[in-house]
Amino acid sequence: MAKFVFVTGGVVSSLGKGITAASLGRLLKSRGLKVAIQKLDPYINVDPGTMSPYQHGEVFVTEDGAETDLDLGHYERFIDINISRSCNVTTGGIYAAVINKERRGEYLGGTVQVIPHITNEIKERVLSVADDSLADVVITEIGGTVGDIESQPFLEAIRQLKGDLGRGNVVYIHVTLVPYLRAANELKTKPTQHSVKELRSMGIKPDIIVCRSELPLSKEMEEKLALFCDVEKEAVIQALDAPSIYEVPLMLEEEGLADIVLDKLGIKTGPPDLADWREMVERMKNLRYLTTIALVGKYVSLQDAYLSVAEALRHAGFYHGSAIEIKWINSEEVNCANTEDLLGSADGILVPGGFGDRGIEGKIEAIRFARERGIPFFGLCLGMQLAVVEFSRNVIGWRGANSTEFDPYTPYPVIDLLPEQRQLSDKGGTMRLGSYPCKLVPGTLAYRAYKKEIVEERHRHRYELNNAYRADLAAKGLVFSGTLPDGYLVEIIELPGHPWFLATQFHPEFKSRPNRPHPLFRDFIGAARKYKESRYS
């Protein structure tokens, strides 16, 4: 039978509950346990797929095509597992399921209420992850902050689960902030005390308190928190600000978090094997080089909108012994007159995915600059589509070439809506989503990176290269180095003769790991390193 760990947050949002949960997952896995992990999100959207990146940050896509919270990306990267759509549950999804059951008559004419119907549905989602994964431990993060009205059904459900499963099978971890008041030159424990009091008023007594803070807690403060929050002193865990999120698992291991969790769950394991993780962190702390990548997008004011891209770049940097400096370039500000000023110092240029026509011409201008100057270029999803548009306009000479997403009346619709998308009216969950195979052409950059013929990558798009123009594009030198195995859809394009110019219709960033960078990101940063060396040699 699986054991369950629930992670809640208090005082303020964005404390790092997701990093805490992911780090615990890594520590448990290092002890030989099979770990499953999920997030319960209190917003009423069914999923974040239609939410603005400014509201939510990036949408992380799973292997099975779920559009999920960005914390699931942390889970995959830290624990090195692929998780499924069942691992992200929202209030909207819960209510939709309950209402559908009511319409089908599954409640026998009863009055449908938050308790028991909504809470039972939540409990079923938590337990189903354990059943499907056959995990030893299931970690569940509850989004939001204790006291939020939206979180109440989730907190009630996890309260009930302790009674359903037995006390020895459930652990509650509460992540809080211990703020530092500069004027008083001291840390304050009162917000944590009040947060725990609020949580206990809902029937949940935390077993472990993880204290986020800028400065170390004194022994007296730990004892005070243990006394007022009614936990053992050893269960007051310090989580200091870290230079890198990848140091957090090692910091929490030193604090004894995993050992306390296992003791409370009655699980005995061998010692942790964190040698690879320690080696990676040590390598990360001793990077010898600096590589500058210009990321040209329209959501750059909120860098979480490109979280997986930024992490994948850093992973590749670790591999090459290089720190990565990301220049966040607003594509709306890029034009032919300022590309040198904005992009001239970059060792590589990356255009990520996105939607809508705002900032499109700036991205195309950035791609032109990379192509003409021989700067390594990497395009992702929309970045590939715009690379095709730029090539069509400026190499072939098709004036007005565009995607029908931005110009339905373009004379050269080199990017067009996928045929299966034409009859769809709903926006949510209707794109080409999830993992699909891609067949690579030997001798290309893509094949040299992957070193195999068939790869699987994750997608999130409605538009694709228009096959009516493939022959003309190829005749002018564009190489289609990756396609669906049947050859129907183009997945990767390249420009031979350029030091490194490659773009993908898929999102390789979602499969990168800190100790195993994605092959394309690895080779992109390698090319950027060579470009930088050639400039200064």
UniProtKB/Swiss-Prot annotation:
Biological processes per GO annotation: 'de novo' CTP biosynthetic process; pyrimidine nucleobase biosynthetic process
Residues that bind Mg(2+): 71, 141
Pfam families per the UniProt record, alphabetical: CTP_synth_N, GATase
Binding site for L-glutamine: 54, 354, 382-385, 405, 462
Catalytically driven reaction(s): UTP + L-glutamine + ATP + H2O = CTP + L-glutamate + ADP + phosphate + 2 H(+); L-glutamine + H2O = L-glutamate + NH4(+); UTP + NH4(+) + ATP = CTP + ADP + phosphate + 2 H(+)
GO terms assigned for molecular function: ATP binding; CTP synthase activity; glutaminase activity; identical protein binding; metal ion binding
Span list, region Amidoligase domain: 1-267
Active-site annotation: 381, 507, 509
Keyword terms, alphabetized: ATP-binding, Glutamine amidotransferase, Ligase, Magnesium, Metal-binding, Nucleotide-binding, Pyrimidine biosynthesis
Domain of life per record: Bacteria
Residues annotated for UTP binding in this entry: 13, 188-193, 224
CC per GO annotation: cytosol
InterPro entries in the cross-refs: Class_I_gatase-like, CTP_synthase, CTP_synthase_N, GATASE, GATase1_CTP_Synthase, P-loop_NTPase
Residues that hold CTP according to the record: 13, 148-150, 188-193, 224
Location of the Glutamine amidotransferase type-1 domain: 292-534
Coiled coil ranges: none
NCBIfam families recorded: PRK05380.1, PyrG
Note: CTPSs have evolved a hybrid strategy for distinguishing between UTP and CTP. The overlapping regions of the product feedback inhibitory and substrate sites recognize a common feature in both compounds, the triphosphate moiety. To differentiate isosteric substrate and product pyrimidine rings, an additional pocket far from the expected kinase/ligase catalytic site, specifically recognizes the cytosine and ribose portions of the product inhibitor.
Subunit-structure text: Homotetramer.
Similarity comment: family membership: Belongs to the CTP synthase family.
Chain's role: Catalyzes the ATP-dependent amination of UTP to CTP with either L-glutamine or ammonia as the source of nitrogen. Regulates intracellular CTP levels through interactions with the four ribonucleotide triphosphates.
Name assigned to this protein: CTP synthase
Organism name: Pelotomaculum thermopropionicum (strain DSM 13744 / JCM 10971 / SI)
Gene behind the chain: pyrG
